[in-house]
C-alpha cells in the first residue's frame, strides 16, 4: 500500500481534527456579495430566461394563459416576501419594496430566493421547467413612477415589435409610430388589444371590511382583512404607487 494512501481511520482523524468554525469563517470571507446589503426603497426585477423557446407552443405574442400564470406568481411573491406591489408584463416581474426588507437586506439571499420562488411557482402552473434571473435596483421614492412607466414602455414596445414581425416577417424594425400605423393598415388595431397585453398588470394589497359575529355575545363585528387585487389600468396603477409613496415618505 502506498504511503500516500489514506485508510478509513486516517480519513476519520483528518476530518475530525478540522475546525468547522475556522473553515466557515474562511470560506464566508470568500463568498462574493455576502456582505452586500440593501435598504428600502428598492425593486427586484425578475426576467424570464429563455422563455421564447420554452413557451413557443403558446399563443404569440402575449398568451393570456401565460400572463394569468405570471399574475398568480406575483400573488405568491407578494405573500411570501410581503412586498408593497408587483408589476408583470411580457416575461418579467418587478417587485417593489417600500417599507419592508426581507432577509435583513442581504442581496445575495434576496436575489437567489426571489428567483427560486418565481421559477418554481411558474413552472408548476405552466407544467414545464422555467427560470428567472433576479437583480436589485436601488431607487429613491421619486423614481417609483418613472421605473413603473419605464417597464410599461419596455413591455409595450416589445409587444408591438412582436406583433409587427408576426405580420411583416422579413422587415427591419421601424420606429414605434410607424409599426403601429402599418399594423393598423393590415387590420391590427392596437387600441382593440386588451390592456394587460399592452400595459401589463399591477398586483397590490387592499383592505376590505368583513362582517362576522362574536361567538360569545352573538353581536355583529366588523373586521378588516388585507387581500390582493390586480389592476390593468396604468392610470390606476400610478395612483396606487403614489398613495404607497405618501405612506412611507
Predicted segments — roles?
Residues 1-249:
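Regulatory and interdomain segments flanking nucleotide-handling catalytic cores
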Amino acid at each position: 500500500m502506498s504511503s500516500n494512501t489514506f485508510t478509513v481511520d486516517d480519513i476519520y482523524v483528518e476530518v475530525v481534527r478540522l475546525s468547522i468554525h475556522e473553515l466557515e469563517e474562511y470560506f464566508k470571507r470568500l463568498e462574493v456579495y455576502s456582505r452586500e446589503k440593501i435598504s428600502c426603497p428598492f425593486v427586484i426585477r425578475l426576467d424570464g430566461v429563455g422563455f421564447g423557446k420554452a413557451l413557443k407552443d403558446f399563443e404569440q405574442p402575449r398568451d393570456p394563459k401565460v400572463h394569468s400564470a405570471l399574475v398568480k406568481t406575483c400573488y405568491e411573491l407578494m405573500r411570501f416576501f410581503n412586498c408593497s406591489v408587483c408589476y408583470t408584463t411580457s416575461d418579467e416581474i418587478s417587485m417593489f419594496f417600500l417599507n419592508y426588507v426581507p432577509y435583513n437586506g442581504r442581496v445575495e439571499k434576496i436575489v437567489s430566493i426571489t428567483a427560486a420562488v418565481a421559477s418554481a411557482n411558474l413552472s408548476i402552473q405552466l407544467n414545464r421547467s422555467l427560470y428567472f434571473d433576479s437583480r436589485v435596483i436601488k431607487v429613491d421614492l421619486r423614481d417609483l413612477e418613472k421605473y413603473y412607466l419605464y417597464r410599461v414602455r419596455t413591455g409595450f414596445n416589445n409587444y408591438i415589435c412582436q406583433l409587427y414581425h408576426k405580420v411583416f416577417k422579413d422587415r427591419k424594425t421601424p420606429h414605434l409610430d410607424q409599426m403601429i400605423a402599418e399594423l393598423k393598415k393590415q387590420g391590427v388595431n392596437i387600441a382593440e388589444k386588451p390592456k394587460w397585453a399592452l400595459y401589463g398588470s399591477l398586483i397590490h394589497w387592499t383592505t376590505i371590511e368583513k362582517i362576522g359575529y362574536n361567538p360569545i355575545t352573538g353581536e355583529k363585528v366588523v373586521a378588516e382583512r388585507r387581500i390582493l387585487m390586480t389592476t390593468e389600468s396604468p392610470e390606476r396603477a400610478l395612483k396606487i404607487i403614489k398613495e404607497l409613496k405618501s405612506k412611507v415618505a
